[in-house]
Swiss-Prot record:
Catalytic activity: alpha-D-glucosamine 1-phosphate + acetyl-CoA = N-acetyl-alpha-D-glucosamine 1-phosphate + CoA + H(+); N-acetyl-alpha-D-glucosamine 1-phosphate + UTP + H(+) = UDP-N-acetyl-alpha-D-glucosamine + diphosphate
Species this protein is from: Escherichia fergusonii (strain ATCC 35469 / DSM 13698 / CCUG 18766 / IAM 14443 / JCM 21226 / LMG 7866 / NBRC 102419 / NCTC 12128 / CDC 0568-73)
Domain of life: Bacteria
Protein name per UniProt: Bifunctional protein GlmU
The entry's keywords: Acyltransferase, Cell shape, Cell wall biogenesis/degradation, Cytoplasm, Magnesium, Metal-binding, Multifunctional enzyme, Nucleotidyltransferase, Peptidoglycan synthesis, Repeat, Transferase
Residues holding Mg(2+): D105, N227
Location(s), subcellular: Cytoplasm
Amino acid sequence: MLNNAMSVVILAAGKGTRMYSDLPKVLHTLAGKAMVQHVIDAANELGAAHVHLVYGHGGDLLKQALKDDNLNWVLQAEQLGTGHAMQQAAPFFADDEDILMLYGDVPLISVETLQRLRDAKPQGGIGLLTVKLDDPTGYGRITRENGKVTGIVEHKDATDEQRQIQEINTGILIANGADMKRWLAKLTNNNAQGEYYITDIIALAYQEGREIVAVHPQRLSEVEGVNNRLQLSRLERVYQSEQAEKLLLAGVMLRDPARFDLRGTLTHGRDVEIDTNVIIEGNVTLGHRVKIGTGCVIKNSVIGDDCEISPYTVVEDAHLAAACTIGPFARLRPGAELLEGAHVGNFVEMKKARLGKGSKAGHLTYLGDAEIGDNVNIGAGTITCNYDGANKFKTIIGDDVFVGSDTQLVAPVTVGKGATIAAGTTVTRNVGENALAISRVPQTQKEGWRRPVKKK
């Protein structure tokens, strides 16, 4: 169906008192992303010409957190209801566009449902998203005559008979810009709350003989709002369960779907295995036959085919070629790169460092601002001393180098191809190819030496 141009209004002015937080409610995160950002992303994916964000409490924090040139910021200085919020945005509506109204604390609304609502909107009428609940207490009821929607009655204003209605308003609707502005101008606050309800436009449209079409979401969770942290945590589990199900159906082996969190996007190959309590953040790519052990965190990284990441390893902004092994308890920080077949063992940290093909750093090592060649062995306790307190410097290690345990490489320094660094050496000057570098205090031995005894 050919749709009109459309703009989106997102209501995000609420304080969120029941969150007991200094952070605006809509900035609390679900799957690692602010709730309102989920809604903004949906609006952009729908192709919104403009996104009008109605804000009130915590406006400065919102503007700091949301970096989107497509956002038009609309202040609602006083929170006098949803109709009042829409009235603040109305001057920005074009007469010939559709206006879709969303909520910043309803984060799981799907693009598919919104597109169905958009397609269903009748010419000159309103598309309304509704659901049926076994217990509709507290929600606005949908009133009908002969099956046609005639209005919405808020729970506090409803009669006993109307409170028996199970079909409720989700608050999400779409209408033409010119119609919306006209109806908004007619709203009054003559109700129990003394507020301007956007829902009153349904009755106004009906009085004009306009058609109101109700559409239901695919899942109830799509229209569930968040008022407290308990509700947020429940929606988090709903979201994570849905993501885990998609991955399982796509061939990813999740050992326990209930103990897996996806906080971004995951691109994967075949026969990927992910153990329990793994967190995927940002944009992550896993190649074929990748295995990830329990308790790992992978963020904004590319993991090549046949890599194995052992338990409790953290990988952030890193790139691993094929057949690399990492961990357990390893940390790859931004700029870490492992070439094919490289190995990083337990308690090894890398940052802005490249480890060549077949090279190994097995234990208790820090490699920062380093370029390490192929088939290099980095002994336990090796440290690249890359920082002098003001500036950082690079360490370069050629192919086939053997670095003994407890070695310090004071950058800037270069170790030539095939060189050997003896255990316990502090390297302060360049080492030539195939040379042995050794710097130790000569060992002495004192016969009959006794340890000090505590004075009584």
